[in-house]
């Protein structure tokens, strides 16, 4: 699921972009959901170019192969590097930032509030609650992202590949403030929206799993 490759396949002409870029090094497989349909398309695509070093699975990612594990690994590095270089051909878009407070809250201040709001009562567990472990990220790229003026728009357009939704859900929670009240309200709204989303799209045999957010964006924090 290389991000650079998905940045190419997810464009309106993504298939052609990848075909032009890779030539006979990799063959492009049209999108299909994971399962039999995708497997059939993969088999057909490989038959059309048996000497290729990889398969571009549109909106999924890249599969590379070779006679040895080392050869397969080297093919992966080569093909992803080509995608990374191709992405740089485009124009760089600068995202305008919001005006941040002079003294924004720190992760150590926000973390306990998040853990408390995400805890769920469960009398079968020690302490009577099911709790979560948070992992914080706040490098320069992430801070530019979460501090963007249009964060509420571009953060909600969906994951770059359906496979990510297994771990992250389809969209993150964007906090409108880092007070206890704002965090509690934000999580409650997320759960409500996710539950409604599940009810709209579920099949009769589906059971909803944990409706809590898996990724939380806090402007000024991370």
Feature annotation, model-predicted:
Residues 2-222:
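Glycine-rich flexible loops
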């Amino acid at each position: 699921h290389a991000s650079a490759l998905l940045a190419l396949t997810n464009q309106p002409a993504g298939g052609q972009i990848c075909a032009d870029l890779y030539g006979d090094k990799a063959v492009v497989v049209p999108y299909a959901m994971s399962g039999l349909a995708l497997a059939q398309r993969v088999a057909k695509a490989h038959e059309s170019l048996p000497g290729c070093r990889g398969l571009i699975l549109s909106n999924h990612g890249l599969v590379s192969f070779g006679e040895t594990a080392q050869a397969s690994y080297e093919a992966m590095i080569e093909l992803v590097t080509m995608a990374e270089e191709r992405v740089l051909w485009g124009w760089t878009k600068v995202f305008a930032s919001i005006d941040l407070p002079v003294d924004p809250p720190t992760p150590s201040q926000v973390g306990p509030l998040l853990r408390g709001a995400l805890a769920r009562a469960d009398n079968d567990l020690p302490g009577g609650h099911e709790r979560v472990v948070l992992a914080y990220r706040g490098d320069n790229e992430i801070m530019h992202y979460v501090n963007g003026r249009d964060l509420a728009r571009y953060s909600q357009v969906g994951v770059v590949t359906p496979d990510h939704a297994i771990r992250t859900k389809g969209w993150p929670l964007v906090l409108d403030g880092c007070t206890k009240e704002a965090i509690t309200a934000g999580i409650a709204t997320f759960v409500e929206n996710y539950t409604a989303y599940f009810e709209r799209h579920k099949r009769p045999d589906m059971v909803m799993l944990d409706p809590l957010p898996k990724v939380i964006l806090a402007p000024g924090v991370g």
